Amino acid sequence: MEPAQLPAHAPEEDVIGVSVARQISPMPEQTANAVPALAEDLIARIVGRMVPASPDVLRATRAGDVFRGFGKALRGSKKLHGLSYQTKKMMISMFWSHSWHGSTWRKYMTLLLFYNGPAAAVIACLGSAVASVLFASELLPVLHGPTNFTEDLPYSHWQSFWAALVGMILYILMLLFWRPVDSIFFDVICIDQVNPKRKGKGLMSIGAFLKASRSMLILWDATYSDRLWTMFEVAAFLRSREEGEMPKVVLRPTILGPCYLLLMLTVILVLTVADNVSVHLLSCWTGSSHFVLWALQFLICFCGLSVNTTTFREYFRSVSDSQEQLASWRLADVRCTCCDTGHVCGGGLCDREVVLKCICQWFGNLENFESRVQTEIMDTFVHEQSRQPFTYSQVVIALVPLLWSYLDSASAYARFTEWDPWLQASCQIARGLAWWLGVGPVAFLIQCRLACRFQRKCSWARCDPLINLLPLFAVVFVIFVAIVLEQLCFVPTLFHDGQTDNMLLFAAFVLPSAWLLYGYVGAGPRLTVSTSKHSIP
């Protein structure tokens, strides 16, 4: 959260004590160098008490305000303090902890998915369902393809395209413009960046902000554990909890935000673009048109999933590296910009010294803090990195275009088929739910597990891209097995004529399989959590 602590003349780095003495109680330049140790002691005592410098300093903002201007606050804008409001103890829902040395656009995408993704998926599905009903009721025109589907197009490729179109538009609009009202702490908004005196008081009250927060969101990247300030925030948050209270820490790797969006884009391209092409190919061509369609779909899958697999392998490598780094973490190894730049600001005040003095107040000595990082904090990181980034609900949200495509098929069946159209439509809906909630998540889990297993780079750099083929072919194999199983479920005649019962049978196979795999295996790495006397979430 470095920019929140910077005077206008300082570089945008992680500085807790930059000119704080001057901002709170200015002193003559000739005496500034004579009292840095006393000033550092004073600042450390104030920060260590975890109380606000004044009642009006403790402020929060709404999560949606950070998204204004397409993440203007994440880019370090300093004129957003007016978006904050005064709050009270434990009234801040979440403290956002992040490194300003990480990618801004990755953080923006990750936050959008974290806060807006579920709402966007729900609204998009409702909108696509309404569009499907309107098309089935002949209130919407045929958007694309032949006017008479029954004469010019095989029934297996009937699509209305309305559900996918409406769903995609609503999802994008909700993702970008939905404004969640959750109260959060974000440095450049909650700490005044213009008024030096108020800025100094805000810096002095950073412990109070942490103590007033019910949970912490860590936007994790490769630079996070290398920075003194970010690790100090985590330690201070754990220290601020009441005796016996389980700290609530939520970790979101910023590298995975774009990855989930790419997965969704891949699914949209495979289903929507390929369906559009199939309407033209299959209504005009014969013979080899199916092979052209399959080749196009495979090409789209190959490009999208290859990038995803590469990103997953990079993420799993960073998780392994961070686990090793935290296991031997030492204060002497983390970076502090004021030391890197030779203390050119602040009249000799040193961020590192202030932080170290606070740590000694809270943990007794530096060795105790390092031990806690190597045990409790490392266990927290490992627990969150292995559990949260690949939950079933997150994968389902990323695969929601599958449902839109089958809603398009259902609406086309309801409109054009002659024999019990609504029964045929219900069959397509059941089929869509099975693929969306069952087959898709299982294929994703297999891809992630193999990416984790083969995370290390090949010693021969030219062969490394070939490793990405293993998860890709595994996904193709899972889809092939699902298609075979689906066809086998079509064979028996169950309770009623039609295929709805058969699709429910197919769903009865794949849905429990997906739930069991995510419940007992998981798509993330199963990392070893060390035994510690400290409690972890």
Regions found by a protein language model. Give the residues of each.
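The feature represents the membrane-entry module of six-transmembrane cation channels
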Residues: 3-537
